[in-house]
């Protein structure tokens, strides 16, 4: 169609009768029709901009759960760790409250409440972070700090974390910029001493510096659809300022650093006395950790400064592990009972068996993470034969199954 013959698809006026004729895909609209559309929208009370609440802030869908509601939800998935849950709930609530009311703190700059979780392997650090993201319905991604390298080195550079986060929300930049990133094993990239390194450190201090930029807020350039970077390519820009970062680690050996700070040492009446329960000692020491201890451990001061909320998790004892096996909504015992139920077979774990499973996990020092492998091992042969065992009504797992490797008791219909 020639320029002279083009007409507005709405009013039919030709280009010569209007000031502007805007071209779209197989359609045109003139400036007069655009003005009419704007007037109609204003009359309906909708000018196309986000609606504002009484406080003048853009409203967001859904009610922000209170700290108490967040903790109640975490209790459904994670056993114990009450102090850590409370610290997480308050920090996360304040973070998203700040995002929902950007003008409320116009006179005061509200900083981000990134979180550092310190606790032994299998104590629930990862599960807490996952459960938080699920409750808040925000994009969530996990990264292993030990796999990260500085940009320019072989390996996964820190910006790929943002690529993964974008992938979790179908490359919706707005959603990604309000997501949660959990970085595990942060303690494994500590530098060897608290003195700055004069050499290149591909997987330690250098990675901390790269993470620092991401955590404190930067615009990360991400390849579209998660491809690899190459010249002459358009990038997606993601502002990490409002992404909540949760870092976690076991920090094995940190207790020694804290002891050096808190105890004078020596012999005689001034000597320090340690409890026979080493786990209780470590839990108490982690509870009084200071930023200077983390610096001595090997984290750079700038990174610690960007992780203002420090929450410590306790070593799980035998009773806590038994509760983990049976109490949460997705408890391991409930999962296996559901699997057996699909074959119309009841699965029962005796109290002695549960205690033995918990004890073995403690001996292996794997915490809750090691429970599944123990249960899987004791039920493997039974699950292999299960579809072919006609008339089977019930499977009973006793103490001897766990401790002596015996077969579970099989109860058939009479």
UniProtKB/Swiss-Prot annotation:
Alphabetical keyword list: ATP-binding, Chaperone, Metal-binding, Nucleotide-binding, Zinc
Family: Belongs to the ClpX chaperone family.
A single GO cellular-component term on record: HslUV protease complex
Binding residues annotated for ATP, in chain numbering: 120-127
Quaternary context: Component of the ClpX-ClpP complex. Forms a hexameric ring that, in the presence of ATP, binds to fourteen ClpP subunits assembled into a disk-like structure with a central cavity, resembling the structure of eukaryotic proteasomes.
Identification of the protein by name: ATP-dependent Clp protease ATP-binding subunit ClpX
One Pfam family, short name: AAA_2
Statement: the UniProt record of this protein carries the keyword Chaperone: yes
Domain of life: Bacteria
Functional description taken from the UniProt entry: ATP-dependent specificity component of the Clp protease. It directs the protease to specific substrates. Can perform chaperone functions in the absence of ClpP.
Residues the entry annotates as binding Zn(2+): 8, 11, 30, 33
SUPFAM superfamilies: Glucocorticoid receptor-like (DNA-binding domain), P-loop containing nucleoside triphosphate hydrolases
Gene Ontology MF term list: ATP binding; ATP hydrolysis activity; ATP-dependent protein folding chaperone; protein dimerization activity; unfolded protein binding; zinc ion binding
Residues in coiled coil: none
Domain ClpX-type ZB, chain residue ranges per copy: 1-49
